[in-house]
Amino acid sequence: MKKEVIAHKNPKSPISEVFRTLRTNIQFMNVSKKMKTLLVTSTFPSEGKSWVASNLAVTFAQAGKKVVLIDADMRKGRQYAIFGLSPKPGLSNFLSQVEIGNDGRLSEDVGNFIQATEVENLYVMTAGNVPPNPSELLVSAQMIGLIDSLKKVCDMIIIDGTPSELVTDSVILSRIADSTLIVTAHKITKKDALERVVKNIRNVGGNIAGVVINKVPVSAKKYGERYYYYGEDKILSGKSKKEANINKKQTSAGNFSFEDRLSNEGTYQNKMEQMEEDNFLRNDDEPFWVPEQQNEGENTSNEEILSDKT
């Protein structure tokens, strides 16, 4: 497992606490309707989408929730590398192989396509093989059947989607998910791009939980200027004075079924070789949460926080 999974590698770090705050606020967003599926998307690549999804999934699992993290970026999925798992079988294999009977039952056990992680309660469905038609697979009955099946045995399903400005996959998934979290990057994400993503999701009937603003400069007075990297993505996150008033909301195992594995979970032994970890996030990295509806009296706008470039 890569060190960018800060919530697991260093659960007492400030960044882990930020993700726990995000988890708590997501849980209490709508107490009348329990959220069980959350889609995480971005506008473009390198905004920290997969990093947010993986750490958020870990914090839900740490709270005792049975969590499945689905890597729905079938073009360029990263979750298998983040957690040190086999890249396949995964989502694309499930959607292309499994059939649904007239009674709604799946022809194969979902657990055959899901892998346990070294984090207790957390399972990952990797993206699988790169299919020729990812968008078509996501609108299939198999995708609906997958989510319905997982809802019966899991407390939380987090879907790591694609960048919404590049392909329509995440917009499609926003109709299935209970709500969508949009990850943006300070001084990188363009305002018009974010507006298009929000509009497209709403046009198909999707709900938006809010926006996480990533790569925000850390206050030099409070923490000192720091830049962090992992893989090819430069991550610069933290809390600046301008954002101070924003609310932070935040493998198949044997011959028994996935449902049985959830109720009889044992100690996971990681047999994968340690993957190369060139660079990683520092422990005190902090993303920000901008709720979909801000409280009255707040005058900090997305325009101030995101890129001032057009």
Regions found by a protein language model. Name each.
Residues 1-310:
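P-loop NTP-binding module
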